[in-house]
């Protein structure tokens, strides 16, 4: 049967692959993509005719209308989809600057978007200030008519990011021309987002000057030289409100017109350059991909939809708007392919196994093409609906729509141009653009023609809290059971996020980053949780400076590999150390707190050796309830105190139950000085035993309240599950079982029988007893703090 199924799947796979290879449209897309690829025409228009496309700018509006017009000219249904509005618009003009004296030098600088320009050419001296300087009268005289050099370094954001500061207001009142900050190469420039009133526009220019020029000028001023600078910055505002739109285009599906494959890229950009890489490259690829599909005569089963988004740089506003307005379509979107990673060629697509297995047959023809940049489908981890997101695919992911990772690989270093003055057309790699547009077109066509939508079950992580242990051998992903084991979960999460006070790591620092796997027992556990660098050279036994009770949940057990638990030195001594099981360790149940399990990366767990490193730990929350679970020191300590009170109450209840049992069942028992209660059932001989004498002994018994039964074995009298009671040799003063039992046996005479109740502190105490671990057999365990009942006989 299995052989027949494998043959059937093999022939299905082959037939799908051959169908794609013989598909005339597939071949036509390839031909056009190689011989008539116009992606760089779109790129040129976006960058060199329209330019930087800031949200709220005329350039963005022009780009949206142009893209819609292009789609319509190719025969697509196209529309502008309103995504939002800004109360005030912004258009950037040219900017110039130079040092006039003590020598003439052109200045390399820029300004963030939505900040003030100059009043024509403005010339003034340089004054160096700190942003916290008190503006005395003498300083105010120096500020008037000056360019103010601030001792702050550029981070891209405007000087008054959230609101106009009091310091800025004082500079304006004192007659400053503008502020200047130092900026590293390449100069990164973002935008101001609090320009909400046409009657209250920014007034003071906000200049970012390349660092070496900034430092040279500052040194001259500090030496007492007068430096004169001139700036001409043409930043223009536009009275709003100004609406901005996504651009939507459709190739209708022939069989499933209400099901979709979405091709997405954001059309907006920052405007200090021309938005070539971020994200003109992505928009141009998507435009060309849809053009190739139309020109090849594609009639896909499902509708292929191109979406060019507005205001991605302002928080994925365009894509979020569309996703929110089209909730009825969520279940009908097979996939969303997004390009916002730069100009390097697309060489792969990463998807979870459940999708990989389904899609592989129709992707193989793309893999088999002789491309300059070979393409490969890759199996990746489960999709996560979490985080703020850095690109528009996140809007779809959060709605449960597959938006796989397109892997780009090549010579361009994205961060060298990202949001900087270098994001220009000359940075684009033409053949990588052409290749990628072709690959996107083929992916869209193949997926749109599948018999069914891409599977989602098993592709997304369920709602919950997850921890990624990034180790030197790979990533281990843990599901944290915060709902059933909240206190222990809060401890782990709080330490990982640096929000629980401890005696080893400074506040705000992740407790586990840089720690090692200090204990690895093959087939048993791997264990970590001691910081690599601790404060004041603390003894590891005292870390993290507190202990908290066990939190046993019956719904979790040690019955398999990959269970996550807290290591302890006895009941209620949990701290920071945790372990992951390497096999069935059911005998640990009840004595160690489990609070999660491995969901991905078990291969990494199995490869960990002692001394391997946890580079970092990151916490992911998915869903409203998970996002509400935000432990801190106060909330954690409150849980600990409540747990301690419960432990105390449970112990008192247990003690009373034991006392009641003894009162009813052994009313005439004798109590020793150590608290052992016993009753002589049968008197032995008058013969007194002596130290070093060997006795033949046997016993049976149980845990007093829990009723776990056990008997003596021939192995030095150790307890076990065995049904038959075994005699054993007990050498007085030498044989050690537990203190209470040893004491009772040593006092007994040959032939004597006793019923004995040994309190936990005289039995196995806080450590409990663990029998020999035999593979394939349940391990015998007496839990810590167990009071034991014995029936003992001295045979001879």
Q: What are the roles of these predicted feature ranges?
A:
Residues 459-796:
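Cross-family detector of peptidyl-prolyl cis-trans isomerase
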Residues 44, 48-147, 153-155:
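Noncatalytic luminal/extracellular "stalk/propeptide" segments of secretory-pathway proteins
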Residues 41, 293-317, 336, 750, ...:
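Short helix-loop-beta-strand segments that form the rim/entrance of peptidase-like active sites
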Residues 291, 295, 414-458:
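His/Asp/Glu-rich mid-to-C-terminal helical/loop segments that flank catalytic regions of hydrolases
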Residues 309-409:
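Metal-dependent peptidase/peptidase-like ectodomains
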Residues 23-25, 108, 112-137, 196-275, ...:
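Soluble metallo-hydrolase cores and metallopeptidase-like ectodomains found primarily
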Residues 109-205, 274:
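Extracellular/luminal Protease-associated
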Residues 20-59, 69, 77, 251-253, ...:
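N-terminal hydrophobic or amphipathic helices/low-complexity stretches enriched
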């Amino acid at each position: 049967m299995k052989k027949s199924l494998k043959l059937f799947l093999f022939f299905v796979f082959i037939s799908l692959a051959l169908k794609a290879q013989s598909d005339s449209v597939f071949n036509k897309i390839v031909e056009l993509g190689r011989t008539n690829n116009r992606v760089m025409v779109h790129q040129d228009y976006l960058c060199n005719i329209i330019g930087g496309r800031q949200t709220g700018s005329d350039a963005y509006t022009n780009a949206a209308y142009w893209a819609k017009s292009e789609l319509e000219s190719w025969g697509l249904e196209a529309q502008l989809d309103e995504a939002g509005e800004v109360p005030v618009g912004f258009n950037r003009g040219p900017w110039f600057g130079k040092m006039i004296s003590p020598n003439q030098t052109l200045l390399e600088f820029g300004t963030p978007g939505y900040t003030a320009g100059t009043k024509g050419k403005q010339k003034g001296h340089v004054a160096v200030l700190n942003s916290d300087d008190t503006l005395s009268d003498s300083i105010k005289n120096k500020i008037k008519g000056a360019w103010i050099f601030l001792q702050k370094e550029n981070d891209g954001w405007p000087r008054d990011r959230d609101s106009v500061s009091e310091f800025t207001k004082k500079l304006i009142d004192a007659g400053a021309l503008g502020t200047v900050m130092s900026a590293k190469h390449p100069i990164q420039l973002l935008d101001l987002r609090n320009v909400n009133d046409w009657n209250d526009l920014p007034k003071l220019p906000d200049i970012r000057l390349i660092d070496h020029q900034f430092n040279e000028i500052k040194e001259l001023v500090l030496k007492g030289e007068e430096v004169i600078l001139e700036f001409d910055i043409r930043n223009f505002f536009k009275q709003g409100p100004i609406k901005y739109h996504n651009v939507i285009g459709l190739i209708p599906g022939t069989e499933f017109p209400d099901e979709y494959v979405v091709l997405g890229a954001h059309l907006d950009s920052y405007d200090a350059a021309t938005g070539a890489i971020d994200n003109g490259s992505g928009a141009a690829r998507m435009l060309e991909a849809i053009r190739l599909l139309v020109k090849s005569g594609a009639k896909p089963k499902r509708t292929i939809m191109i979406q060019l988004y507005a205001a991605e740089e302002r928080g994925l506003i365009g894509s979020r708007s569309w996703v929110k307005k089209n909730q009825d379509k969520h279940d009908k979107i097979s996939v969303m392919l997004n390009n916002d990673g730069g100009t390097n060629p697309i060489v792969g697509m990463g998807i979870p196994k459940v999708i990989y297995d389904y899609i592989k047959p129709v992707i193989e023809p793309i893999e088999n093409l002789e491309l300059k940049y070979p393409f490969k489908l890759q199996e990746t981890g489960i999709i996560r609906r979490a985080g703020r997101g850095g690109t528009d695919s996140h809007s779809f992911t959060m709605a449960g729509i597959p938006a796989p990772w397109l892997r780009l690989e090549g010579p361009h270093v994205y961060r060298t141009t990202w949001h900087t003055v270098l994001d220009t057309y000359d940075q684009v790699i033409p053949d990588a653009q052409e290749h990628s547009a072709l690959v996107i077109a083929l992916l869209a066509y193949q997926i749109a023609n599948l018999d069914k939508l891409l599977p989602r079950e098993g592709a997304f992580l369920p709602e919950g809290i997850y921890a990624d242990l990034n180790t030197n051998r790979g990533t281990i992903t843990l599901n944290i059971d915060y709902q059933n084991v909240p206190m222990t979960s809060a401890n782990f999460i709080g330490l990982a996020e640096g929000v629980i006070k401890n005696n080893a790591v400074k506040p705000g620092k992740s407790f586990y980053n840089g720690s090692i796997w200090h204990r690895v027992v093959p087939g048993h556990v791997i264990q970590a949780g001691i910081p690599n660098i601790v404060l004041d050279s603390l003894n590891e036994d005292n870390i993290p400076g507190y202990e908290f009770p066990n939190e046993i949940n019956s719904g979790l057990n040690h019955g398999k590999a990959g269970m996550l638990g807290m290591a302890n030195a006895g009941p209620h001594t949990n701290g920071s150390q945790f372990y992951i099981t390497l096999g069935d360790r059911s005998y640990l149940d009840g004595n160690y707190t489990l609070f999660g399990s491995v969901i991905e990366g078990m291969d990494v767990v199995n490869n960990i050796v002692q001394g391997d490193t946890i580079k970092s730990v990151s916490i992911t929350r998915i869903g409203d309830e998970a996002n509400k679970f935000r432990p801190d020191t106060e909330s954690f300590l409150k849980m600990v105190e409540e747990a301690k009170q419960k432990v105390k109450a449970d112990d008192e209840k247990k003690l009373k139950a034991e006392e009641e049992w003894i009162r009813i069942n052994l009313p005439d028992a004798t109590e020793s000085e150590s608290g052992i209660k016993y009753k002589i059932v049968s008197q032995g001989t008058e013969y007194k035993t002596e130290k070093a004498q060997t006795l033949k002994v046997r016993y049976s018994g149980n845990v007093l309240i829990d009723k776990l039964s056990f008997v003596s074995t021939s192995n030095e009298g150790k307890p076990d599950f065995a049904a038959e009671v075994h005699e054993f040799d007990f050498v007085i003063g030498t044989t050690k079982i537990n203190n209470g039992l040893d004491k009772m046996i040593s006092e007994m005479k040959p032939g004597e029988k006793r019923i004995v109740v040994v309190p936990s502190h005289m039995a196995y105490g806080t450590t409990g007893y663990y029998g020999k671990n035999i593979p394939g057999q349940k391990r015998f365990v007496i839990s810590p703090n167990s009071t034991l009942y014995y029936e003992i006989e001295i045979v001879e």
